[in-house]
Amino acid sequence: MKHLIIVESPAKAKTIKNFLDKNYEVVASKGHVRDLSKFALGIKIDETGFTPNYVVDKDHKELVKQIIELSKKASITYIATDEDREGEAIGYHVACLIGGKLESYPRIVFHEITQNAILNVLKTPRKIDMFKVNAQQARRLLDRIVGFKLSSLIASKITKGLSAGRVQSAALKLVIDREKEIRPFKPLTYFTLDALFEPHLEAQLISYKGNKLKAQELIDEKKAQEIKNELEKESYIISSIIKKSKKSPTPPPFMTSTLQQSASSLLGFSPTKTMSIAQKLYEGVATPQGVMGVITYMRTDSLNIAKEALEEARAKILKDYGKDYLPPKAKVYSSKNKNAQEAHEAIRPTSIILEPNALKDYLKPEELKLYTLIYKRFLASQMQDALFESQSVVVACEKGEFKASGRKLLFDGHYKILGNDDKDKLLPNLKENDPIKLEKLESNAHVTEPPARYSEASLIKVLESLGIGRPSTYAPTISLLQNRDYIKVEKKQISALESAFKVIEILEKHFEEIVDSKFSASLEEELDNIAQNKADYQQVLKDFYYPFMDKIEAGKKNIISQKVHEKTGQSCPKCGGELVKKNSRYGEFIACNNYPKCKYIKQTENANDEAKQELCEKCGGEMVQKFSRNGAFLACNNYPECKNTKSLKNTPNAKETIEGVKCPECGGDIALKRSKKGSFYGCNNYPKCNFLSNHKPINKRCEKCHYLMSERIYRKKKAHECIQCKERVFLEEDNG
């Protein structure tokens, strides 16, 4: 009888299967096999506590049946889902669905997907950690309660489609606060006095008549000119020369947040893209040794490194760079995050032997770039510090002092691998008390800059420092805010949209703890305590739920509705009522103000450019774009009285290329294409790129696997569906 190993992803299952003999069967759960019901709160709440109502997703039902049948035939079923709390919970749900005692399922975890790692963990299984599971359940229930209850309230007071959530709203407030600093900012002009002394010493005025000048202090142009005129007449000497040796410490290896930050700044990758590529590198790619994982687990807040990996790195440094670059002892790093899960490892290559050059014919260009970044950072983390000599020279006269600074690299250390963008700034050879001639003195104007908007990388850095969310939530949180149209990211800068201001205004006034970073961080600590058996998850939920629901009820009464519908001056053709403009998550539309008694609606004039000025040849009505399982088409807005439809293929204004959506594989344009079998969406770079989708791709990312989403009709309901993992979100629902 075969042994069964259950992992999360098909790619991981395929890789692991290559390492094992025929006595093992490896199957993927494809993420969560069950979750809270999507069409209700999904939690029973009474005096006994909080009972989640888990439902198997329709797309997982056949898979679950398959896993149950395989488990019945297996002598041992190993739960080998990811090592974080989410993975522990997925393993727990799989075991529950199979049935039997939880203790009967050996639990194995691995930081890397290599043959040795897999064979070793099979020898040392443990049990499913219910404390970790309860921590994940508490997080899931908390987020559902906040999202479901608060989103419903926000949508009822502002407009349908808006949402709020425990982590997303705290993150959004950071963006809003920065916008509030930027919008009223008024630039200030200030002046500096910059001198050039012979032989070529550049210095800046730091004090005048015994008073030190503060940064941006000199704002009067006339005053700056007067000081310049006075100092030009003075004689100068070298007042002091200070030289100091300074170390540039080696950077630690990557954890999730720092990998996302570096990939953003150095490679231009979004956090979502970084995690998607990292997942592929972790789960298994082609190498000269066969298919295997080439990096360790990518969702981690730990800086620990396995002893064997440290020894490999040190041996590599000694061999390739010599003993001068090798510290006496291996360098050990610890995370600044007090809640870091130190049992995990930092992100590193699974084998230091697999140099980037050895993989250039096996990895895609972007995979190779990210792997190279991880490889070099890990190897550099075990090298000697770089050493600099800093110089500071003060030039003085009776009325003022000028200062010049320089730096010289003495030993490159870790820069040997990572490179050094800072060029040496060498100062001329000088002696204290020697006279020096002023060659030129200039008064230069400068303008203060507003606070910089967050980039995705800098926002993640702040979220991490404040304890908001965990490594697994940083990228999905930013994607979620984009998908909700709260923020936009242009040229690496995050700016808030107007709907975000309205939501945060309400939350700050009525639910201040939801947007308080300290509150969010304290909840993360509570979840950590649950995972460590220091807190009861039912009590944590209870302590949060009842005060929160009191505020929800108060909000229903006290929050003033901001829904204002613009009048069109037109009458409803069905009941004679007034037509007004409304908004939904699908955009602007026109509806009768007698709703719900009258349900007449039509689209605005600027909606759906494809249908603009297109009239129904049967009744004279307006042809509007609609969607079916076969894609987009035109239909008369007088349906059901008129059932005229028209293919977009024959529409003069139809757009073949999808605006604002790029291919997730190569970055090319995506266009509607046709074959004998029907229409589909494909990449314009075909045949170099084979991306295709049966449904129209949209500029949103899957919150589960971060791949591109599509829009479709599923069982007569509008839905967004991931093109890769098929995760589906019905647009009628909004759980936040």
Curated annotation (Swiss-Prot):
Its cofactor is Mg(2+). It catalyses: ATP-independent breakage of single-stranded DNA, followed by passage and rejoining. The record marks 32, 139-140, 143, 299, 484 as: Interaction with DNA. InterPro entries: Topo_IA, Topo_IA_2, Topo_IA_AS, Topo_IA_cen, Topo_IA_cen_sub1, Topo_IA_cen_sub2, Topo_IA_cen_sub3, Topo_IA_core_domain. Mg(2+) binds at residues 8, 82. Residues 2-113 form the Toprim domain. Its EC number is 5.6.2.1. Residues 163-168 are annotated as: Interaction with DNA. One of its GO terms (molecular function) is zinc ion binding. CDD domains: TOP1Ac, TOPRIM_TopoIA_TopoI. It comes from the Bacteria. Residues 129-552 form the Topo IA-type catalytic domain. Pfam families: Topoisom_bac, Toprim, Zn_ribbon_Top1. GO terms for biological process: DNA topological change. NCBIfam families: topA_bact. Releases the supercoiling and torsional tension of DNA, which is introduced during the DNA replication and transcription, by transiently cleaving and rejoining one strand of the DNA duplex. Introduces a single-strand break via transesterification at a target site in duplex DNA. The scissile phosphodiester is attacked by the catalytic tyrosine of the enzyme, resulting in the formation of a DNA-(5'-phosphotyrosyl)-enzyme intermediate and the expulsion of a 3'-OH DNA strand. The free DNA strand then undergoes passage around the unbroken strand, thus removing DNA supercoils. HAMAP family: Topoisom_1_prok. Belongs to the type IA topoisomerase family. This is DNA topoisomerase 1. It comes from Helicobacter pylori (strain J99 / ATCC 700824). The gene is topA.
